């Protein structure tokens, strides 16, 4: 259902931006009544003749998006000095050197952040017991190994504290990563990372924690995971050290089911239970260590790259984005619209031949590609459908304007500006 809604919205937006709906019988010989958005391609190429119609369509579109029946009438403009002072106080924009108001594009930044978050994967990997005592093994999933840019990586460990009195309230917990022979090239780098030469280990995270209550503790390991991914590796092996835990009776829950029973006695005997001993195995399993990884593909990853929509330059006749800017000053709307100075009323036009319509990056969705596959092969009921040039990516727009009561309104409007076009 969301997909159908999106397709309908994009088609409607494109139609509103470009031209008003034709009256019956007004369609020219090149019109495509079975594909409303395809009518964009039939616009007159003589821009001066078609511009008034375009501008009127843009006006109607803006008023509709602002939920206004008509433009506000500004009878007594607010003095410019008072306006600029209010904008500064409200932090809704800034005044440029030329005196024009520049609205802060918070919504644009949020949209970029949301797009980035959509491209980020979050993976949780539970620890397995390593080959040696007090070591943990984290195997990063196949999906994680396909990602190459680490946004955040953390190891979560549970510190269990008995109710008995303790002589120490703070303990230091260290995460040490075993290095392969020859794994560290530069001596200075190794020294900075805390290389333990006798064990060939690197200190990758350290934290002083409160030993008065049982709780989870988080250890950042982003740089270590990034190095592993850069080296093409998909697993992390760490040794957990807590030299002061035995003084407080505190213990770190380190083990999964593997090797738990054979090590818990030894761990408790030697250092106060650092091996994660506990009477209730199910409860201890709920405190099993895990690695939380947030990562994404790099910009130049082959699966990340996609074909950008074409810009209309007069040399192509296939589906492309046509730039069209309407200045609010030129249309007499700068008396009530404070910012921005105009509207990028971009629209889509061009043909969608069969070899383009189903191409990755040019089609609106996977659904469109499947439909085109059947359409090209003449399968009913898709044989008579036509592929249309429509917006495939839109971005929001922020507006600062006066209402009829001389109030200053800031409104963020979603899906207002066409960024890319493709074949539906």
From Swiss-Prot:
Disulfide bonds: 312-320, 319-389, 348-421, 352-423
Name of this chain's protein: Inhibin beta A chain
Chain's gene name: INHBA
Disordered: annotated span: 257-288
Biased amino acid composition, Basic and acidic residues: 261-273
Keywords linked to the UniProt accession: Cleavage on pair of basic residues, Disulfide bond, Glycoprotein, Growth factor, Hormone, Secreted, Signal
GO cellular component: activin A complex; enzyme activator complex; extracellular region; extracellular space; inhibin A complex; perinuclear region of cytoplasm
Cell compartments where the protein resides: Secreted
Entry's Gene Ontology BP terms: activin receptor signaling pathway; androgen metabolic process; androst-4-ene-3,17-dione biosynthetic process; endodermal cell differentiation; extrinsic apoptotic signaling pathway; eyelid development in camera-type eye; hair follicle development; hematopoietic progenitor cell differentiation
Family: Belongs to the TGF-beta family.
General function of this protein: Inhibins/activins are involved in regulating a number of diverse functions such as hypothalamic and pituitary hormone secretion, gonadal hormone secretion, germ cell development and maturation, erythroid differentiation, insulin secretion, nerve cell survival, embryonic axial development or bone growth, depending on their subunit composition. Activin A is a homodimer of INHBA that plays a role in several essential biological processes including embryonic development, stem cell maintenance and differentiation, haematopoiesis, cell proliferation and tissue fibrosis. Signals through type I (such as ACVR1B or ACVR1C) and type II receptors (such as ACVR2A, ACVR2B or BMPR2) which, upon ligand binding, phosphorylate SMAD2 and SMAD3 intracellular signaling mediators that form a complex with SMAD4, translocate to the nucleus and modulate gene expression.
Superkingdom, natural source: Eukaryota
Main location: secreted
InterPro entries reported in the protein's UniProt record: Cystine-knot_cytokine, Inhibin_betaA, TGF-b_C, TGF-b_propeptide, TGF-beta-rel, TGFb_CS
Complex and partners: Dimeric, linked by one or more disulfide bonds. Inhibin A is a dimer of alpha/INHA and beta-A/INHBA. Activin A is a homodimer of beta-A/INHBA. Activin AB is a dimer of beta-A/INHBA and beta-B/INHBB. Interacts with FST and FSTL3; these interactions prevent activin A interaction to its type II receptor. Activin A interacts with ACVR2A. Activin A interacts with BMPR2. Inhibin A interacts with ACVR1; this interaction creates a non-signaling complex (NSC) that inhibits ACVR1-mediated BMP signaling. Inhibin A interacts with ACVR2A.
Signal peptide range in chain numbering: 1-20
